[in-house]
Amino acid sequence: LGGAGGAGGVDGAIGRGGWFIGTGGMATIGGGGNGQSIVIDFVRHGQTPGNAAMLIDTAVPGPGLTALGQQQAQAIANALAAKGPYAGIFDSQLIRTQQTAAPLANLLGMAPQVLPGLNEIHAGIFEDLPQISPAGLLYLVGPIAWTLGFPIVPMLAPGSTDVNGIVFNRAFTGAVQTIYDASLANPVVAADGNITSVAYSSAFTIGVGTMMNVDNPHPLLLLTHPVPNTGAVVVQGNPEGGWTLVSWDGIPVGPASLPTALFVDVRELITAPQYAAYDIWESLFTGDPAAVINAVRDGADEVGAAVVQFPHAVADDVIDATGHPYLSGLPIGLPSLIP
């Protein structure tokens, strides 16, 4: 998905940002835990014929790169290689991501690992239809809702394998967990001093997956600044402590504003019952009473924990904001998104 675009940047300052993006700044990664922090550079594939024609193109294995896409792949490989070495290289089942990953893999003598969780969000019956169309709008509705804290919303594309945001996010976070584990198994330190891996994926999966999981989401960027071909979205953190958005196509992302932090608190509160309800629903089809009982029990525990944590999280964020330098920067808004 997404039109043709030029190579994006891979630089950015570590920090938290959100609905309001300020200048980048150092910030603590995640909200707790002693897990080792890593950096993941999510890189969108190069141009495909579908991109050039502005078509919805998500099916596996899909087409390869255009001549321009091959040039973009080599250009981003050269840029990334200069910032290496890397702990790992990953791509999806889509030919276009594999062809985009190949130049970097060849330069560094590494073998990319294929992760289905990096596949593009599946468009079902809307495959090969124009992006600018009713089908294109319907394709967007579900994933946008997922980033706003409603993963239970179904994908409004009949036939999609990503039936809702819960299914999509579990596949995506599973891929991220694999990247994390593999990175720690080969803890090569990049030029900037961080353990870093590169994951080649697709525009919507990168955007929606990161916005659903980072502690500084900015969902509007999905619409105002779609990731271009070979553009990069950089995150830092770990599965235990959480993930922070570092940069979006070269735009540094600064610390979270108070509204963003409170949004994340609400997101954590309202997603817990959605996941619990979906797990209970799935357990009903197993025909196993024990599975249903376990799903109900686990769901109750998760919802209870979210309810207990919510007021503490809100209080912490308000207290932090009282003396936080970015509190005075709340008026920073949409005009500053794109320099």
Which functions belong to the PLM regions below?
Residues 1-37:
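Glycine-centric low-complexity repeats
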Residues 36, 121-131, 190-195, 211-339:
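Acidic, low-complexity terminal tails and accessory targeting/binding regions
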Residues 38-115, 229-230:
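Active-site-proximal alpha-helix that buttresses catalytic centers in soluble enzyme cores
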Residues 40, 195-201:
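Generic beta-sheet signal
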Residues 46, 203-204:
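Active-site metal-binding loops of divalent metal-dependent hydrolases
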Residues 59-68, 94, 152-162, 166, ...:
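Active-site metal-coordination segments of metallo-dependent hydrolases
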Residues 78-85, 102-109, 177-184, 211-214, ...:
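Sec-exported extracytoplasmic/periplasmic mature domains
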Residues 108-174:
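Phosphate-handling substructures
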